Amino acid sequence: MGPEGADVIACRVVEAEPPEVREFLAREWALADRGLFGADLDWTSRPVVVEARAGRELAGVALGEVVAGMARLHDLLVAERRRGRGLGGRLVELFCVRAADLGAARCFLRCPDTPRHRSFYERHGFTTIAVLPRYYHGHDFVEYLREPLAQEDRGER
């Protein structure tokens, strides 16, 4: 029991996010950021979408976001018949260029722990920061980080 006269706080599950939740998060995260980082961080999500096309056909995509100076690559996928030709690497590099343009200093991603994934991401400047045993459907996943994000080549490929 709390001190006499303390407010009773009720917790409940709600079906939709009330507008005041966004206001609460913005206000309280700003206070938490100042306490933890000594600065206000911009938590606005800025989407990063890089596509590869062969004519009108979508051949691959890198999809993610930049939030508070950190890029997160959510999806990287190349059409099965287009794999093995360097397209995934080109998508990752352009994703990183765009993320840096939006203020990101580093890029984070999570993917299955396979030799192919490990080799690919290490070739593109990522290092392993965590292994997540049995993370998804019993399979291990790896978290990778690329820092610094910017590379010398900043053009379209």
PLM regions: where:
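Conserved catalytic-core motifs of GNAT/GCN5-like acyltransferases
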Residues: 108-110, 127-143
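A short, internal acetyl-CoA/4′-phosphopantetheine-binding micro-motif in the GNAT/acyltransferase core
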Residues: 76-83, 112
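Conserved N-terminal entry element of GNAT/NAT acetyltransferase domains
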Residues: 1-19, 147-157
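Conserved acetyl-CoA-binding loop of GNAT-fold acetyltransferases
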Residues: 2, 122-131
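Short acidic/glycine-enriched loop/turn segments that link adjacent beta-strands
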Residues: 46, 115-116, 135-140
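Conserved acetyl-CoA-binding loop-helix of GNAT-fold acetyltransferases
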Residues: 84-97, 123
